[in-house]
Swiss-Prot record:
Belongs to the V-ATPase F subunit family. The gene is atpF. The keyword Ion transport applies. This is A-type ATP synthase subunit F. GO terms for cellular component: plasma membrane. It is a peripheral membrane protein. Component of the A-type ATP synthase that produces ATP from ADP in the presence of a proton gradient across the membrane. One of its GO terms (molecular function) is proton-transporting ATPase activity, rotational mechanism. It is found in: Cell membrane. Keywords: ATP synthesis, Cell membrane, Hydrogen ion transport, Ion transport, Membrane, Transport. One of its GO terms (biological process) is proton motive force-driven plasma membrane ATP synthesis. Pfam families: ATP-synt_F.
Length: 100
C-alpha cells in the first residue's frame, strides 16, 4: 500500500522530502477533485492525505465518499472541521481501537 498526498505545492513539499512519491500539486479546486478521482481509481493507494481546507472545497457527494472510505483511508490535516477523528478512521480501517 502506498500513501498519496494532494494539496498545494507548499502542503506537499514536506511529504516529498519524507520520501512520499505520489504527491499531486493541485493549485485549483478542480485539480483537487481531479486528483481525488485519480487516487480513488488507483488500487495501490492505502492512505490519502488532504489539507482540511481542500477537503471542505470538494463537492458534498465526493466528500461523503471520502469520509466513509476505508480503502483508501483519508486523513485530513490542518484545522479540525468535523468528520471523523484520526482515531475513528484508524479504528474503522484496522478494525480495532489502537488507543486502548
Amino acid at each position: 500500500m502506498e500513501i498519496a498526498v494532494i494539496g498545494n505545492s507548499e502542503f506537499i513539499l514536506g511529504f516529498r522530502l519524507a520520501g512520499i512519491t505520489k504527491t499531486y500539486a493541485a493549485e485549483s479546486d478542480e485539480k483537487v477533485v481531479e486528483y481525488v478521482h485519480k487516487v480513488l481509481d488507483d488500487g495501490k493507494i492505502g492512505i490519502l492525505v488532504l489539507n482540511s481546507s481542500d477537503m471542505a472545497k470538494i463537492p458534498v457527494r465526493l466528500r461523503t465518499t471520502l469520509e466513509n472510505s476505508v480503502h483508501p483511508t483519508v486523513i485530513t490535516l490542518g484545522e479540525e472541521e468535523g468528520g471523523l477523528s484520526m482515531r475513528e478512521r484508524i479504528k474503522r480501517s484496522v478494525g480495532v481501537d489502537l488507543w486502548k
